[in-house]
Amino acid sequence: MNNYDVIIIGAGPGGIFGAYELIEKNPDCKIAVFEAGHELAKRKCPIDGKKIKSCISCKSCSIMSGFGGAGAFSDGKYNITNDFGGTLYEHIGKQPAIDLMEYVDEINMKYGGEGTKLYSTAGTKLKKVCMQNKLKLLDASVRHLGTDINYVVLENMYAHLKDKVDFYFDTPVESVEVLYDENTAGVDACSLQEAHTDNVSGYAVKTADSTYESRYCIISVGRSGSKWMEKVCNDLDIPTKSNRVDIGVRVELPALIFSHLTDELYESKIVYRTQLFEDNVRTFCMNPHGIVVNENTNGIVTVNGHSYEGADKQTENTNFALLVAKHFSEPFKDSNGYGESIARLSNMLGGGVIVQRFGDLVRGRRSNEKRIEEGLVTPTLSATPGDLSLVLPKRIMDGIIEMIYALDKIAPGTANDDTLLYGVEVKFYNMEVELNDKLESKYKGLYIIGDGSGVTHSLSHASASGVYVAREIEAER
């Protein structure tokens, strides 16, 4: 039997910052971190654009799992705001949430992010321009590390932690069991589970090879761990509620078209309300001079975007997502399944990601290689030319088209025929777990943080939740 003070499941942003803060507060704290994916240096996607051009569904996706989580190869944007990125503030308060995100920013600067720019919407005239065109610019400060610097920060944090924390890579956790004090012998399990009780003595974490015990357990499995998280909640009778799924496309166009926005703000979170259905369509994950990439979630290939801080890796294009949030009511509960079914349809029709010119979309015709090659925008991702209207539901497709025309008013050229749309992009959200103001479940000492909790949806919020829970644990100990 292996015993620890704290076991952390998942080495994404929440798990990393949780471990970091625990060690900062108490260097003698005995911590184990279990991660289903590889250590950072071994995270290599086999797609090279030559021999392997599309996803081969590796057992452990190096893009989505491993040290650093799904954010390891992202463009490293840390948005310091309560306006988007999660609802952490609903649990801990608005100012405490901002304070924690600013603390995370300080740590990132300490471990390799120094010199990167902090952008802000404060005082920008672009907010008025958006309002004049039925668009809303959300407030935020944005620290852009870039995919390259983000990786360096993770390397340095791992170097700091590896001798202080026991990391178990390529070690999926099979189950989490609640342990009770000996004085509860004879009390039936149902009675024990009815209350958030002091009778809990710790947790047993089981892998394929062994069992590990700890007084405290932090679960931080990210979005890719959504199905596993749902199973744990079902097994332990932890209440959850249905969340949402965001569905849309990734837009790629010449960087010059959005340069007046990206030069000042880097990333602008812009929201538009459609006229017919009053759905909210928003920009997401803007990557100036970036590239479009594949993403694998549960064996389904979707699209994403990256950008780099180093000038030698930058392109002439900017890309961003346009997403429509779909919230579901009873009796439907499987919002992620809905998103997966749409992504699977894209995979079936195109063998992966589909790309289409905006001009072809509005004319009701599929794109072909010839028209894309002759266009003004050179694709940064090898994708199958096709027709996205055969994949996306009409309501979502109409909303995206409306949004593109709205953006064209503040960034003329957005609605050019040669603007490229890649599909589909899906942002999956975990079922939101019922947690108290300590981010603690109904079981004392069992914390659920990061995107796996359904509470956070961003690097900054997930990282902040890890710091917060670490401080709660140390305050109690």
Task: Set out the residue ranges of the language-model regions.
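Residues forming the flavin
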Residues: N2-T81, A122-T124, K128-R477
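Dinucleotide-binding Rossmann-like beta1-alpha1 core, especially the glycine-rich loop
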Residues: G66-T116
